[in-house]
Curated annotation (Swiss-Prot):
EC number: 3.6.4.12, 3.6.4.13
The name this protein goes by in its record: Regulator of nonsense transcripts 1 homolog
CDD domains: 1B_UPF1-like, DEXXQc_UPF1, SF1_C_Upf1, ZBD_UPF1-like
Provenance organism: Neurospora crassa (strain ATCC 24698 / 74-OR23-1A / CBS 708.71 / DSM 1257 / FGSC 987)
Record-level Gene Ontology MF annotations: ATP binding; ATP hydrolysis activity; double-stranded DNA helicase activity; RNA binding; RNA helicase activity; single-stranded DNA binding; zinc ion binding
Compositional bias (Acidic residues): 61-75
Residue ranges of every copy of the Upf1 CH-rich domain listed in the record: 95-252
PANTHER family: DNA2/NAM7 HELICASE FAMILY, REGULATOR OF NONSENSE TRANSCRIPTS 1
InterPro entries: DNA2/NAM7-like (IPR045055), DNA2/NAM7-like_C (IPR041679), DNA2/NAM7_AAA_11 (IPR041677), Helicase/UvrB_N (IPR006935), Helicase_ATP-bd (IPR014001), P-loop_NTPase (IPR027417), SF1_C_Upf1 (IPR047187), UPF1_1B_dom (IPR040812)
Protein's cellular compartments: Cytoplasm
Region annotation Disordered: where it falls in the sequence: 42-79
Binding site for ATP: 460, 480-484, 650, 687, 818
Amino acid sequence: MANMEVSFTHLGNHLVSDSAAAIKAGGSDELSNIDPDENLLYGVYGGRGPRGNGRRRHDDDDNETEVLDDDDDESLASVPVDGMKSLKLDAPVEEKELPPHACAYCGIHSPSSVVKCLTCNKWFCSAKGSAFSSHIVNHLVRARHKEVQLHPESSLGDTVLECYNCGTKNVFILGFIPAKSDTVVVLLCRQPCGASTSTKDMSWDISRWQPLIEDRAFLNWLVTPPTDAEQLRARHLTPPMIAKLEEMWKEAPNATVADLEKTAGVDDDPHPVLLKYDDPYHYQNIFGPLVKMESDYDKKLKEAQSEDGLQVRWHLGLNSKHVASFILPKIESGDVKLAVGDEMRLKYKGELRPPWEGVGYVIKIPNNQSDEVEVELRKSANDKSVPTECTHNFSADYVWKATSYDRMQLAMKTFAVDEMSVSGYIFHKLLGHEVQVAPTKITMPKKFHVPGLPELNASQIAAIKQVLSNPLSLIQGPPGTGKTVTSATIIYHLAKMSNSQVLVCAPSNVAVDQLCERIHRTGLKVVRLTAKSREDVESSVSFLALHEQVRMNTTNKELDGLVKLKTETGELSSQDEKRFKQLTRQAEREILQNADVVCCTCVGAGDPRLSKMKFRNVLIDESTQSAEPECMIPLVLGCKQVVLVGDHKQLGPVIMNKKAAKAGLNQSLFERLVKLQFTPIRLKVQYRMHPCLSEFPSNMFYEGSLQNGVTAAERLRKDVDFPWPVPETPMMFWSNLGNEEISASGTSYLNRTEAANVEKIVTRFFKAGVKPADIGVITPYEGQRSYIVNTMQNTGTFKKESYREVEVASVDAFQGREKDFIVLSCVRSNENQGIGFLSDPRRLNVALTRAKYGLVIIGNPKVLCKHELWHHLLVHFKDKKCLVEGPLTNLQPSLLQFGRPRQAYRPQRSHTQHVASGPSNGRFAAPLTAGSVRDYETGSMVSYIPDDVSSIHSSALGGAALSSGYPAMFSNFHPEAWAGLPCAGPNGRPGAKGRGRATESIAGESVANSEFTDATSSVIGGKGIGQGGASLGAGLSEAIGSARPTSYSQSDRLKQYVESNGRMGVGNGYRRYDDDEKSVSTAFASQIGTGFD
């Protein structure tokens, strides 16, 4: 197989076979003759493969470089970039001078196996070594490069891979389509060209579009894998060495492998966080460097976010400030993360007027309605010079500020040097010391219900009693248990009983606003302190904001007069401005001192306006989403009574720097106290979900302790006509076997089959009368989020406005929120790459607990069931008869049988011991003991940042029709010249069809074969199967990819099924992929039609 030469001729953007017949003849038996060592599945289940050690680690990061994120310690992303202390370079036996086109990693230089990166001009090969990504794909992802060129001596010549229609060169969105009547392969981008309606009239079958990158490597017929002998002779770099080399190239592009030895002894890993600390200086010495690491990383990331050549639209905001609207391509590619309130600098460098620059704040980020960023410029003396008449030649820079990190460092310093910053008891508890609480006499309120809030249940009242009588309390609020109401009630009683102010904080502005609104209902005097940069951002509690209360305060006539003068004229004289600021500060102090409750973010608690104030009572909501130093900011303002509210079984803090996260900066103070056996008070009655939806999360994550405060009847929308498998149980897992693909950014994933079926489900809800605002679509991957948004807009049969109003976002964006109906798209569908983000139990817990009336999960159960947690979930759905497959109009119970997962899952119990109040369930295994808790990384992802450049601009490019005219040179080619080409019927006769007709799939409805399309072919993961005809996987891949090792992809399994007359046999010592032969055989038979021959 390795010696077989594959010859192609490159004609424009068509790839034409010169030796197809020889390929077909030589590759007929390759599937059964591959050595087990070459099988990618071999290492997954043990032996000498990369996963043979049996250990797993989840190492996601907020930059969403999920393509390099595996579940094993040998993967490229699971190893730190640094940590080179013990690295050794394994040089080849005979080191000699390598040609310029040698792989920059390993030195392999076979022309057919190397590819040139057009961004950095380095060459890389298709070898994988000990990782799961080929060297070229690994480099493209890590370096954020996307354009490549083949070697001049390769069979295709020095081809630059690009779309035949629009010319885009992003390899992550490029794929190929075989022509129906010509012996050519056409390269098209996934969107818009590969999905353009104008393509349907062409001689190309767009349902057969396949990506050029599969299994994290270029297709074998495009870039040949090196032989075993070449790999043995090559330089062997470990994944940490490759990661370090990529980092070196960012600073020194000409660095070589030899330069790695110079840094091999450097080990600058920070000291990990501890459970206990000797004193506050010890505490500061541990956390201080971690905060600095995160700060430096954030600064480097933000300062690299410069964007040139922008087109800007101008308009005046309601406050008469200039607003600039523009699209940032780097946001769409996932390289830039923006949030409302971030500061940006706009510059004009055109020729129509003198250079200009202005600074403003982000007031809008891309969402379903618009891909634009909106920046509101700050008022300045030269407002008239804003170039509103210009629209081109602008640039944008991110203005990085160290405010958040400086306040964390200052809080830790204050904790160390100021004895009055916290009480003695809190001081010792924060350091992890054993200390007895001093007995205090308090008079409990006669009734705990407060005006303006709902009645409390028994567990809420118990929590409030315990909080009021203890100086430090943790409240664990599982999903839907009313922790916001409980927190607001606690704040009311603390304010009334202690007759002192309460400081209320949370890590996000959204969480602060929600709690602030509830507290206001109780009648307490509340002030919402916001950052200066967010004063113009609309919120539900704007009327409570400090700056707004100052503006509305008319008791100070002088200040009122200056406010009106400034509003009318836009500016004040220097003397008036000085007096205005003085009077404003006085008014702010008065309002703050007279307030019962002050609400702000944790970082906002470090605002200088609060520096002179002392807060005896501090409550931090969503504290499990705050890094510990962030929580310290509000605590060092004199607290004597602290309440931390959160849920350590849901998502944790977002830490950008992997080394800092690995050292423990991603652990919240709440979690550390739990590990110190400080038992949280758990709220036990959930009011959100239908009881069938709360059963699994309760048993798996909360030891069966959750009780239902709502009945099944109260959470059943009988007015909604939806094909639930069990009408009284509004949940289902819809089996979809579509393959995952890499998104345009190269750092995320998408699944076209799942996206198409999400649209079908949303449309069905619309037709049943569900409002768009009541539907939420959750997906862990930004690539899928962007693709779903565009799929609904482009193919949805309902009103376009309705689809735009459906929120499509990441799990993180939905934490703390709820929708009537939730659709969860799992995306991951592969044989040996793992399931990435999905393996995080805390992320799954959040995703499963957002829906009130119904939950639909779309995923590939065959892949997901290999993970222990998902295995339990799938078995649960199957026991409830809610695991289904087939078209949405005719769902059938899945026949899938589950084997044992790779590792038995045990829910984390940490150090808390809660007695389960619900009935025991033998399906959910007993928790581990405290000493054997397994830790899971919970890296997070920022949502609402468009990723697929192509999908964002599909509206702009979609009108470009594909040329129907082939070059004249193709007139000599006929289908008979290539017997394996899918367009040729049996015996090479064009247009001939097999007997029988294709039936609808029961393996999840395909993209093409649905009630909303008129296409005659079905799709499994984008591989089209005509009525009785051969599939792309069974035809073209056999002809042009016979050298491909067995991967058990959809096409390979389909091919094996066809060739074995309907039997999915076990190949030469490989583990059989399908545990349930009947299910898969039935699925394939329905896709192909019974008359296939």
